[in-house]
Design a protein with these regions (language model features):
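Small-residue-rich segments within alpha-helical transmembrane domains of MFS-like 12-TM solute carriers
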Residues: 2-3, 69, 85-93, 124
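Extracellular/periplasmic helix-loop-helix junction of adjacent transmembrane segments
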Residues: 6-38
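MFS 12-TM fold signature
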Residues: 34, 58-65, 84, 149-153
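Conserved MFS/SLC helix-loop-helix module at the cytosolic interface between two early adjacent transmembrane helices
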Residues: 36-74
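Helix-loop junctions at membrane interfaces in 12-TM secondary transporters
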Residues: 69-80, 135-138
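Cytoplasmic helix-loop-helix junction between adjacent transmembrane helices
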Residues: 79-117
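Helix-loop-helix hairpin linking two adjacent transmembrane segments in secondary transporters
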Residues: 115-158
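Flexible cytoplasmic inter-helical loops of multi-pass small-molecule transporters
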Residues: 158-179
Length: 183
């Protein structure tokens, strides 16, 4: 969705009558909001488990990205963008943690490499789809692409399990306090 938003900026500017400075402020505010929310979500992943938060990330980011398409104004657009950055961004560290905790050492590098390729591959696919979708349907319909990842929630629920190391850590150690982040 990072690529989608970037490609949609000219059309968003035109629809809402925004200056370039206002667009930069929206993008900055969305990333700041997303970063702050991501800290809280990362803390929650250690508290409730990686797998539930990974599923939440897939489900939540799919819907949040799609909801951008119906944003009635700039404030809603910024809030949805920030929330989608945080919720979607959560999948990356959680997936990395699951891979390092679950994969045998001989496969860990391969799977981390496969995880790393997702970002540039997603950006490339978004670039290709965006050209066509923006031209044919406009910026709002572009964000419905976020729903494409919904079937992954079923795959995760069906085939992944909470890493035993994560379960063991939660059962032997008291849950981390939010203030521990700043200690």
């Amino acid at each position: 969705d990072l690529a989608l938003f970037g490609y949609a900026v000219p059309a968003i500017r035109a629809e809402f009558g925004l200056t370039l400075s206002e667009v930069m402020a929206i993008v900055s505010a969305a990333f700041l909001l997303g970063g702050a929310l991501l800290v809280v979500l990362g803390w929650l992943a250690d508290r409730v488990g990686r797998l539930p938060l990974f599923q939440f990330s897939l489900l939540g980011s799919s819907f949040l990205v799609a909801l951008i398409s119906i944003a009635p104004g700039v404030i809603t657009l910024t809030a949805l963008r920030g929330a989608s950055i945080a919720v979607g961004g959560l999948s990356y560290p959680v997936t990395g943690a699951i891979i390092t905790e679950e994969m045998p050492a001989r496969l860990r590098g391969l799977f981390m490499g496969l995880l790393q390729i997702g970002y540039p591959l997603g950006w490339a696919l978004a670039s290709l789809w965006s050209m066509w979708l923006l031209t044919e349907y406009g910026w709002r319909q572009l964000f419905w692409v976020g729903l494409v990842s919904l079937p992954m929630v079923w795959v995760v629920r069906r085939y992944l399990r909470e890493p035993p190391r994560s379960v063991a850590a939660r059962s032997t150690e008291p849950p981390p306090r939010f203030s521990d982040l700043f200690a």
